[in-house]
Amino acid sequence: MTLQLNTIALLLVILLILGVLSNNSAITISAAVLLIMQQTFLSSHIPLLEKYGVKIGIIILTIGVLSPLVSGKIQLPDLSGFLSWKMALSISVGVLVAWLAGKGVPLMGEQPILVTGLLIGTIIGVAFLGGIPVGPLIAAGILALLLGKI
């Protein structure tokens, strides 16, 4: 087996290093898995990840978000809780963020190079500004809004 030393491999190594430096396990693990896949016989499965990866990731994320409800850690509020202005605002923000993320998916497909910029921006925000990684889908949705794609 010979290593493929190409631009994509270099980018994945850089993302891996930035992920480690910024303590961002999602970036670190993703870059490591893709680098291993690219450099081994697993490369034939990359088109499957490309086709279904975002959908599978969203399903896993949704399971993670809903699991506290199922486990009982989070209780549903009573009717008066749903009628408060804070609940109405939180629902509205949730709708806006979901809509933005939905607009980000096509942009990521149309211009995948922008994903690299979004990831680098996220890593910089985490490493130097004390931010937390909120997800490239939402960032891509905001970018789509700024680029006039919406």
UniProtKB/Swiss-Prot annotation:
It is a multi-pass membrane protein. It comes from the Bacteria. GO terms for cellular component: plasma membrane. It is found in: Cell membrane. The keyword Cell membrane applies. Keywords: Cell membrane, Membrane, Transmembrane, Transmembrane helix. Pfam families: DUF441. Disulfide bonds: none annotated. InterPro entries: UPF0756_TM (IPR007382). The chain crosses the membrane at residues 1-21, 52-72, 81-101, 123-143. Belongs to the UPF0756 family. This is UPF0756 membrane protein CGSHiGG_08995.
